[in-house]
Amino acid sequence: MWKLSAILLVAAASAVVIPGHREAPALTGQALIDYVNSAQKLWTAGHQVIPKEKITKKLMDVKYLVPHKDEDIVATEVSDAIPDHFDARDQWPNCMSINNIRDQSDCGSCWAFAAAEAISDRTCIASNGAVNTLLSSEDLLSCCTGMFSCGNGCEGGYPIQAWKWWVKHGLVTGGSYETQFGCKPYSIAPCGETVNGVKWPACPEDTEPTPKCVDSCTSKNNYATPYLQDKHFGSTAYAVGKKVEQIQTEILTNGPIEVAFTVYEDFYQYTTGVYVHTAGASLGGHAVKILGWGVDNGTPYWLVANSWNVAWGEKGYFRIIRGLNECGIEHSAVAGIPDLARHN
């Protein structure tokens, strides 16, 4: 039965047609918002406090969006019972990381954020809640750099390399700049917005520099566990199949995954609904965490956690059409399995 449902949903997704307009790719600002809201009814665009020039600093070079080669894909199994709706927050409600929206601020660290978020989730899930913590995006961002490593810090990085780094070097704990949670919390403060009643200073003119890699805890709360003893490791890192059912099976079985996609100007104007690219030029690449899926008025979607704080989108989340590889989101999924025995 689920296969028939899947076929019908893919057909529904394929039937989504956005009326073309020869000037749509060049639209910007209010003209873009007006066009998006008149051209389709799946999602709503609205004015954002942070301008486009600042949003681009949160993105990474599109060179980091290379789709996986078929021979590199490991996770290809398909479950016999895929539900129409799934939300990891409901499936594993006791895992603190799953419902946590982070803020990458003025740095293209999305690749490290999405990895740290999904790895935190999977560690909690695999341990049945025994290891329930937030793992550090800062540890990845600052230390997994260089030509033969993840990439270039705040300029972007390869998601699969972040997961391989976790397998080889492990990740320490670390939460947000605001909470100073764990061994190595994020060191770049939020900027240019009011979030949860706190007004942060204006963002700097230039992209924040990549934090320096240090092999010690940096929390201002004087975290007691030494850096090397705080490491959490993975046993495997791999690419996930490009088919919808393969991605769903991986999430059902092991938890949220990391994906990357092309961001167009209309995406950052997203406020609610099921996103489908409608207008505006390409701005760069972005990595995020998929934690579920569903159907909204017949339109299948992925449920995704962004890292632009809770003031953006649907309280930090967004939904994007499922089954069309929208903006490349279904061809770059990566994941891994925690090594609980190796946990320090």
UniProtKB/Swiss-Prot annotation:
One of its GO terms (biological process) is proteolysis involved in protein catabolic process. InterPro entries: Papain-like_cys_pep_sf (IPR038765), Pept_asp_AS (IPR025661), Pept_cys_AS (IPR000169), Pept_his_AS (IPR025660), Peptidase_C1A (IPR013128), Peptidase_C1A_C (IPR000668). Residues 1-15 form the signal peptide. Disulfide bonds join C95-C124, C107-C154, C143-C213, C144-C150, C183-C217, C191-C203. The active site is at C110, H286, N306. It comes from the Eukaryota. Gene3D superfamilies: Cysteine proteinases. Its EC number is 3.4.22.-. It is an enzyme of class 3 (hydrolase). It holds the Pfam family Peptidase_C1. SUPFAM superfamilies: Cysteine proteinases. Keywords: Disulfide bond, Hydrolase, Protease, Signal, Thiol protease, Zymogen. GO terms for molecular function: cysteine-type endopeptidase activity. Belongs to the peptidase C1 family. This is Cathepsin B-like cysteine proteinase 5. The gene is cpr-5.
